[in-house]
Each structure stands twice: as structure tokens, then as C-alpha cells.
A protein has these predicted regions:
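Signal-peptide-cleaved, periplasmic/extracellular N-terminal interaction regions immediately downstream
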Residues: 1-66
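Short, well-structured beta-strand/strand-turn elements
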Residues: 20-31, 106-113, 117, 227-229
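Short beta-strand motif preference
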Residues: 14, 68, 247-249
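Flexible glycine-/small-residue-rich
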Residues: 18-20, 43-45, 70-72, 140-142, ...
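Catalytic-core regions of hydrolytic enzymes
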Residues: 48-193, 202-214, 218, 232, ...
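Structural motif
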Residues: 38, 65, 135, 244-246
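Active-site-adjacent mobile loop/cap segments within catalytic or ligand-binding domains
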Residues: 41, 197-289
Length: 289
């Protein structure tokens, strides 16, 4: 029900208020990699408690919010095909088709990050998704490569390296860090504590993104050959929201003449949109988000 962290000169205090009986275990971890000493607390709902938590009631009656991000836009055309096809136009068309398909689902609320040929910074896209309290963020793109024979679809999520460097940027904004920490009051002296919590949140989000991406790849493979059979990971800024599972989908290669031609057709755009929709439905059905 409520979580609060405070610190005095000697102690770090952790308060948890719950409507249900809970059990907990705690243990410490020695320094590893970029992390120092850590305290891990696992909290379990006691089997004796039959009351359904209020949060579960809310989730059951609320819609799953899917943020659909059409890459590039406005002054940023993205990749340009040999025939002059602009990535920003293709991905907006696919995004609108996906939006229309998801709109028909009773338990889903789709959000278009951009619904016209407009320019948005990568961080503006993240902010809009967070403002709408998105449960899943999907950025749609069309790939390009020096190798003109490169083809197929790919799915990427954030890498751990990208996450660690991003955490410092998020913490630079006091309002963002407070919001991401669930409203906990953390002053300037507690940035190290906030960093640990934010890193933990990012790690969980990346793990969720990876699980979701594998399902998405399986569904994309039904309508398109895969360029990468496994999920790719990189430091895409648009995927760096610490609290929203996110993935970037490269639908096909505009740099490949055959795939450029395919990307321009309504049939392929509809097939890709449907595959993404089916992937989202499976992700929800399996309780990943």
C-alpha cells in the first residue's frame, strides 16, 4: 500500500505498509562489477491472507496502455530507400494500422506517440509514454545497412550498459527521479541510494522487455524473415524509460530494393501491423506486462 525510504546519520530505514499479511526475507550481496554492497529484500504475500490487494482490483478493471512510437518524423526522414521512400512515412502508416487494430481490443488502450509528420525528440517520446502511464512502449522503424542484401525484421531492447549510463541522466532531473521512485523523498545527499533503486528498476524493466521481445520475434517471423533470430540489445535512447518495458522493431530494410518495394505495399504494412498486434496480445495473455 505504501513504501517509504528514509535515512539518518547512521541508518537507512525501510517502511512498508500493507493491507495484507506479508512475509519477508532479506540478505546482503557483496560488491560486483559497478555495484557496491547491496541489501536485497524479498516480500511475499502470506497464504493466510485471502483478501485481494487493491492494486490487483485496479489492474483487473483497467486497460493495458500500449504506446506506439512511429520512428523519426518531420525534419528527420530516417532511412531513405533507392526509390525515395522515406522511413518516417512508412512507419507512421504501419503505426496507424496497428493503432486501429488495437483499438478494437476491449482490454487495450493504444496511444500514438506521433499521429502526423511531426518531429519529436527521443526524450519527448518517452515523456509522452510515461504521461499516459504506458504498460508497453513499441518503437517502429525500417532498417538500413551498407550491405544492400541485408533483409528481414529485428527486435531490439535496451542493453544493460545503456541503462547504467542513462540512470545518471534521469537522476539529474529531481522531479523525474522522485516520480520514478514512487514519490519517495530523496534529497541531494541520497543520490547514491536513488541510483541503486533506479538501476534495480531498470534491470527489472529490461528483463521484462527481453521476455516480451522473444514473443514479438516469434510473431513477426510468421509474416517476415528475421534478420536477427534473437533479440538485439543496444543503447537506444528511445528505449531508456526505467519503468516501461520497451522494444524497437525494425520491420524490414529500406536499403534493400526488394524490401523497399514490399514496405510500400498496404498488404505488407497490414501484415506487419497484425503480427505486432498478435505479439502484444500474447504478451498480455502470458502476464508479462
Amino acid at each position: 500500500k505504501k513504501l517509504k525510504l528514509t535515512r539518518d546519520k547512521e541508518n537507512l530505514n525501510f517502511y512498508l505498509k500493507s493491507n495484507n499479511f506479508v512475509k519477508y526475507k532479506y540478505f546482503s550481496l557483496l560488491p560486483s562489477g559497478k555495484y557496491g554492497h547491496r541489501l536485497v529484500i524479498d516480500i511475499y504475500l502470506d497464504k493466510k491472507s485471502k483478501k485481494i490487494p487493491e492494486t490487483q482490483k485496479v489492474i483487473k478493471n483497467s486497460k493495458v496502455v500500449i504506446a506506439i512510437d512511429a520512428g523519426h518524423g518531420g525534419k528527420d526522414p530516417g532511412a531513405v530507400g533507392k526509390k525515395g521512400t522515406l522511413e518516417k512515412d512508412i512507419v507512421l502508416s504501419i503505426s496507424k494500422k496497428l493503432y486501429a487494430l488495437l483499438k478494437k481490443e476491449k482490454n487495450i488502450k493504444p496511444i500514438l506517440i506521433r499521429n502526423k509528420d511531426s518531429y519529436m525528440t527521443l526524450r519527448q517520446r518517452i515523456k509522452k509514454a510515461r504521461r499516459h502511464k504506458a504498460d508497453l512502449f513499441i518503437s517502429i522503424h525500417a532498417d538500413a545497412a551498407k550491405n544492400k542484401k541485408a533483409k528481414g525484421s529485428s527486435v531490439y531492447v535496451l542493453s544493460q550498459h545503456g541503462a547504467s549510463s542513462e540512470a545518471a541522466k534521469w537522476l539529474a532531473n529531481k522531479e523525474n527521479s522522485s516520480d520514478l521512485l514512487g514519490g519517495a523523498s530523496i534529497d541531494d545527499k541520497d543520490n547514491e541510494l536513488a541510483q541503486v533503486i533506479l538501476d534495480m528498476s531498470q534491470s527489472v524493466t529490461i528483463e521484462t522487455s527481453l521476455k516480451a521481445s522473444r514473443i514479438m520475434l516469434k510473431n513477426l517471423n510468421k509474416v517476415s524473415k528475421l534478420h536477427l533470430k534473437n533479440t538485439g540489445q543496444a543503447g537506444f535512447v528511445v528505449l531508456k524509460s526505467p519503468d516501461i518495458p520497451s522494444m524497437l522493431i525494425e520491420t524490414a530494410f529500406l536499403s534493400n530494393a526488394k524490401e523497399e518495394k514490399k514496405l510500400r505495399t498496404k498488404k505488407f504494412q497490414k501484415n506487419i501491423a497484425k503480427a505486432i498486434k498478435d505479439g502484444i496480445l500474447e504478451i498480455i495473455r502470458k502476464g508479462i506486462i
